[in-house]
């Protein structure tokens, strides 16, 4: 952040939300060095120095830059009277300047000298609390409130602490104010002179995080300003779909009219935000006219079962169709059948339990889990009815192995679908949330990196909030649509057993099919002269004499290819002691050169910044660099398939491991970035494959997954629910891979 040298930079008109759009900026950092501040702002400082007392200018400059030594020298020498440390024209005190520049040490010192924390000055007649809140400086706000600052005081625009917190768009400050100020000193629906509540301002700014949090504290969606606008009306003006969705879900009336007789549909038409409004309506169960979409199933379980079993039927019909009629007609029929099934599911089935009108919604349903299980079903059916009767005598062990593999595979699949990936429960006790916030403030870690803004708990290292599970997942790896669940600490090992078992079953099935086709060739070789070009005689016999089984084999082998890539990636990342999510984030972070994005809403003062914050395991989420191919999420059909099969991760591993992504840079390590949880391959594998219960037999530690939140990390037992610091690394050089 640039140092603030003039109140003009924070002046906000008091007319309409349009005039106040400048105040809805993202939180900004104020951790530049003094030298940077001096070079950037020297002309303004000199102009100010010419206009007022040089000693006062020096004092204010020291407050702005956090030069505590100079501030102490001036105060203790009696050069400045703290009861009058401002210019009579500007009326901006040293505490104002220290507050708006996030200089906590100066703020502490000035308050220790009994300055007036509620002194109102500047063009807006605002207090230091207002100045700090406008820029989202939660540490300054906390300290000022603890030392007597009054949150109910309003500035010349009629804004109090809550309004200015919303204007800052810093969700961390909003959460702090809601927990520590609202109800006791402020009403959540308090209004400014134009009748606008905090929720109305957040909706206009398109700040979905603040809107969601305000609604959790029961902010009114029915409140109207002097123009008759509700939060939904102003949200429609902005056109942020998530904001509209949150408001509609909480009972906002989209038919309600403003004072000039316009409802949300008319406003959306005028502001060209109809697409956002219609999308939000569909996600909340309404059509584009605002009427409820009919639901044809009473229980979501029933609709999920329909979605799950639909691919079973489709795959069987598809194989039978291609095995029975001409390929051209089969292709046309299959496309029509697929489109019809997709339309039916999205219109009549999925709306009963999933969000609508989003490209990713279909992937967050049991459909792909049904595709996998349906594939296993038809492979098993083919084996049981066609392959086994003709190969049991020749290959009894192989048939028994396939049967055992399918049973184990089905058991692991059911276990994974029903498993707990390691969910950290949401904290509902507000007193405990307050304790957590204060604890993080004291150590300089109250930001979205260390505090979950959705579940209100301190975020352990290696955890991530899952939109699917709506909870924090410990040692989060990825969401797997093929098992309809997240993969985390408590089911990651089971998942690896699952894909290893699946790959083994595919190879065994291939061997049995080739033996079966050989039997068919021997049976019919005297009656037919087969010629299939590049295919061998066995495959040719299978294609001609049992096309259905041939197609099942082809589909199964295709699955085996991408599962093989997935297995390689998982085993590689396990040996490196990193999860899929961590590896992807680290790779993207290396390619991201935009350091201006503050995705974690960090406003930690310099005095509280910890060196551990340089830990690359929890990096700042990359910004949007359209020229960086690794930063782009493909929205094409091919791109989605590429992601679903895990081939994108395989390519990323190859690039980062062998330097394909960055050939121009000299590299001494096997990876182009440091992994904080890589303790050497032996230790990493032990941490992953063995539970932390050293009293249990080794076989049990290997086969069982963690039953609680405790697991090994660097050979030590750690509680992943409370993992806030990584164990120190100590591994041998020969262990590095």
From Swiss-Prot:
The EC number(s) this enzyme carries: 2.3.1.225
Region (Disordered): 1-47
Record: active site: 480 (s-palmitoyl cysteine intermediate)
Chemical reaction(s) catalysed: L-cysteinyl-[protein] + hexadecanoyl-CoA = S-hexadecanoyl-L-cysteinyl-[protein] + CoA
Alphabetic keyword roster: Acyltransferase, ANK repeat, Endosome, Golgi apparatus, Lipoprotein, Membrane, Palmitate, Repeat, Transferase, Transmembrane, Transmembrane helix
Positions in the Cytoplasmic compartment: 1-304, 347-364, 418-493, 569-737
Transmembrane segments: 305-325, 326-346, 365-385, 397-417, 494-514, 548-568
Highest taxon above the source species: Eukaryota
Cited function: Palmitoyltransferase specific for casein kinase 1.
Protein's recorded name: Palmitoyltransferase AKR1
Organism, scientific name: Lachancea kluyveri (strain ATCC 58438 / CBS 3082 / BCRC 21498 / NBRC 1685 / JCM 7257 / NCYC 543 / NRRL Y-12651)
Lineage: Eukaryota, Fungi, Dikarya, Ascomycota, Saccharomycotina
Encoding gene (name): AKR1
């Amino acid at each position: 952040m640039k140092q603030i040298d003039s109140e003009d930079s924070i002046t906000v008109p008091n007319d309409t939300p349009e005039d106040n759009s400048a105040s809805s900026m993202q939180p900004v950092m104020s951790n530049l060095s003094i030298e940077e501040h001096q070079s950037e702002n020297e002309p303004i400082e000199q102009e100010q120095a010419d206009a007022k007392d040089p000693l006062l200018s020096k004092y204010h400059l020291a407050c702005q830059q956090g030069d505590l030594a100079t501030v102490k020298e001036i105060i203790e020498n009696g050069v400045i009277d703290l009861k009058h440390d401002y210019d009579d024209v500007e009326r901006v005190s040293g505490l104002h300047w220290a507050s708006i520049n996030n200089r906590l040490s100066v703020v502490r010192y000035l308050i220790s000298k009994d300055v007036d924390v509620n002194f109102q000055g500047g063009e807006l007649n605002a207090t230091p609390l207002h100045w700090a809140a406008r820029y989202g400086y939660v540490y300054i706000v906390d300290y000022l409130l603890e030392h007597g600052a009054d949150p109910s005081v309003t500035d010349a625009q009629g804004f109090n602490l809550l309004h200015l917190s919303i204007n800052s768009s810093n969700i961390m400050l909003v959460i702090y104010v809601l927990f520590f100020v609202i109800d006791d000193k402020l009403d959540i629906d308090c209004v400014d002179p134009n009748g606008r509540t905090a929720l109305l301002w957040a909706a206009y700014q398109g700040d979905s995080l603040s809107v969601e949090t305000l609604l959790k504290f029961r902010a009114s969606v029915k409140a109207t300003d002097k123009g008759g606008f509700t939060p939904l009306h102003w949200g429609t003006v902005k056109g942020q779909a998530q904001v509209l969705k949150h408001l509609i879900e909480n009972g906002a009336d989209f038919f309600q009219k403003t004072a000039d007789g316009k409802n949300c549909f008319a406003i959306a038409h005028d502001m060209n935000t109809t697409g956002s409004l219609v999308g939000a309506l569909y996600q909340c169960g309404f059509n584009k006219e605002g009427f409820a979409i009919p639901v044809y199933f009473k229980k979501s379980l029933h609709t999920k079962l329909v979605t799950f079993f639909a691919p079973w039927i489709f795959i069987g019909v598809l194989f039978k169709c291609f095995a029975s009629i001409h390929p051209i007609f089969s292709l046309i029929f299959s496309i029509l059948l697929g489109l019809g099934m997709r339309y039916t599911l999205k219109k009549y089935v999925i709306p009963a339990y999933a969000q609508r009108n989003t490209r990713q919604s279909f992937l967050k349903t049991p459909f792909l889990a049904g595709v996998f299980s349906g594939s296993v079903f038809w492979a098993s059916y083919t084996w049981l009815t066609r392959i086994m009767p003709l190969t049991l005598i020749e290959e009894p062990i192989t048939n028994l192995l396939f049967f055992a593999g399918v049973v184990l595979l089905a058991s692991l699949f059911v276990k994974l679908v029903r498993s707990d990936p390691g969910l950290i429960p949401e904290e509902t006790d507000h007193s405990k949330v307050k304790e957590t916030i204060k604890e993080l403030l004291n150590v300089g870690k109250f930001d979205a990196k260390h505090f979950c803004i959705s579940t209100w708990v301190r975020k352990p290292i290696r955890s991530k909030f899952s939109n699917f599970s709506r909870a924090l997942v410990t040692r989060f790896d990825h969401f797997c649509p093929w098992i309809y669940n997240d993969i985390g600490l408590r089911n990651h090992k089971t998942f690896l057993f699952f894909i290893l078992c699946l790959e083994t079953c595919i190879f065994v099935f291939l061997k049995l099919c080739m033996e079966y086709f050989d039997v068919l060739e021997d049976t019919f070789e005297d009656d037919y002269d087969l010629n299939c070009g590049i295919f061998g005689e066995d495959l040719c016999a299978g294609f001609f004499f049992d096309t259905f089984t041939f197609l099942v084999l082809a589909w199964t082998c295709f699955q085996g290819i991408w599962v093989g890539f997935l297995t390689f990636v998982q085993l590689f990342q396990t040996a490196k002691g990193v999860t899929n999510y961590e590896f992807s984030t680290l790779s993207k972070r290396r390619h991201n050169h935009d350091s201006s994005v503050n995705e974690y809403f960090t406003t930690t003062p310099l005095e509280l910044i910890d060196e551990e914050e340089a830990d690359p395991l929890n990096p700042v989420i990359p910004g949007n660099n359209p020229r960086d191919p690794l930063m782009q999420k493909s929205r094409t059909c091919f791109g989605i398939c590429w992601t679903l099969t895990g081939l994108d991760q395989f390519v990323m591993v190859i690039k980062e491991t062998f330097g394909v992504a960055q050939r121009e840079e000299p590299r001494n390590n096997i990876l182009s970035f440091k992994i904080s949880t890589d303790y050497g391959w032996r230790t990493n594998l032990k941490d992953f494959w063995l539970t932390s219960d050293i009293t249990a037999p080794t076989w049990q530690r290997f086969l069982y997954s963690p039953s609680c939140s405790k697991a090994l990390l660097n050979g030590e037992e750690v509680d992943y629910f409370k993992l806030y610091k990584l164990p120190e690394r100590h591994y041998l050089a020969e262990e590095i891979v």
